[in-house]
Amino acid sequence: MLPWPTEAPGARLADVRDTSLAKIVRDEILARIMRGELAPGRRINEPDVAERLGISRVPVREALRALESSGLVVSRKNAGVFVRELAPIEVSQLYELRAVFDAYAGRKAGALPDAARRALVKVLDAATAGMRKAARRHDVAGYYAENLRFHWAIVEAVGNARFSDAYRDVVQQLHLWRIQNLSQGLAMAASVAEHDEILRAIRAGDAQRSETLMASHVHTAHGRLENRLYKETSR
């Protein structure tokens, strides 16, 4: 599972008994942003979205307001709504926040009761196997998806819906930056090794080590991304 829709839910528009139309439209737009179809800086045309989905502009407007509150789009007076472009300082702040979140989740995961921890470890085993396979194929998109599954499984294991929501907002915003900068091939083998260490700590029920490794992993990942971006812009 990923912390955002992986497919545009347009087919659900015919059945809104359990979900508000605005939320379905929000998920539709969000899925397109996360897939990179609506890139950072691109204007989202409200009438076009409404016409494509065969609905009025009211739920589209509500959906865009929800996305703005999540930090994914920005509204500019007399210009419209645009997919947000992150400044480097914002990215650094988000990574600092994510490191705190991941450390907390790692500590909680390492302290789970045995049965719950074993269930989590099965999911993490599958995700690390997927990362390893993607790394061998040099499949950056596949690797990133498995990486997200790994971290999201740990976050969900905390069992705190508000924490999961806050983490989701941070990861979604960081994903904008990845799309914006098209970072590729980010030392996947080294990253797999870091995930293996985290997995071993959680499997052993070592909450303190899980916490430390999760924070270190996020800081190291940020450093790798920054170094690659610096090299690309220095060419």
Where are these regions (language model features)?
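Short helix-capping and inter-helix turn/linker motifs at the boundaries of alpha-helical repeat units
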Residues: 20, 121-122, 186-189
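Conserved amphipathic alpha-helical segments that form helical-bundle/coiled-coil interaction surfaces
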Residues: 94, 98, 116-179, 193-200, ...
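Hydrophobic residues in alpha-helical segments
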Residues: 33, 109, 113, 135, ...
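C-terminal regulatory/effector modules of DNA-binding transcriptional regulators
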Residues: 29, 52, 186-235
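Short linear motifs at protein or domain termini
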Residues: 1-111, 222-235
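Acidic/polar helix N-cap motif
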Residues: 87, 139, 205-206
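Short alpha-helical transmembrane interface motifs in multi-pass membrane proteins
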Residues: 87-88, 177-181
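Short helix-capping/hinge motifs at transmembrane helix termini and TM-loop junctions
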Residues: 110-111, 159, 183
